[in-house]
Amino acid sequence: MSNIVKVEDVEKVKGLFGDWENNFLPSCLQGIMGEVYSFDCDNPKSAVAVIGDFRMFAGEPNENLLKFDYKDSECDYKCGEMDIIIPQNDKWAELIRDTFNSDLEGVSELKEIKRYSTFEDMSQFDVDKLNEIKSSAKEGFEILDIDEEIYNRCLENEWSKDLVGIYNNYEDYSKKGIGVVLLDTRNNEIVSGASSYCTFEGGIEIEIDTNEQHRRNGYALICGASIILKCLERGIYPSWDAHNKGSIELAKKLGYREKGEYTAFELYRK
């Protein structure tokens, strides 16, 4: 598996991904963030796009590409204990099940899940409603842009790392990213945040996280409305790919329309 290499010229692998509509692919295929790996960069048959925790496999299903450990590669982005694997088609999904459901070294569990995509349509958002949601923050709470201080604070806490975590540093985030947090000013505590998980031409993929101790208070809704409004002001699209039922229901409250569900896998490493 040592001949798996990072693809420097992504134009050579774009054909493998075809017209696959996936919110995380553009960042990789446009060369903005993330990376693509393959066996033969000149005549690739299979490839995987890697960004943050996400792995998107395309082309001819290949077991060695699935087993490749990006932690030991030149991958610039930090890999966590869980990978989210997205297959291009049923053949890839079948190979993923066969490969990781066996007793494979370094893998503790494979969980098959459904994710939910949304329609990309600027006209679906009700700005007045979003402003109403944003202004519903109670007294003592303040919505702040993610500046360098907030960026560093997000990295300090496990629950908020994903808000900014796959950008190289604050300079990289300030150029490509956009985000807000909700601060409890009474104790200077960040309770929730919404930010760009990744960036692509003309848009971002939204990441929303809330401190577990402060969930079910409407904070995610407030942060979600705030970042959508910021994106609309900049003329960029706030893309939303939901990881679970709760996420898609939150998206609907903010104006998104569900497009459909698709199969993905959570791969937990030892």
Regions found by a protein language model. Name each.
Residues S46, V191-S192, G260:
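A structural microfeature
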Residues G34-E35, F39-Y151, F265-E266:
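Acyl-donor-binding surface of acyltransferase catalytic domains
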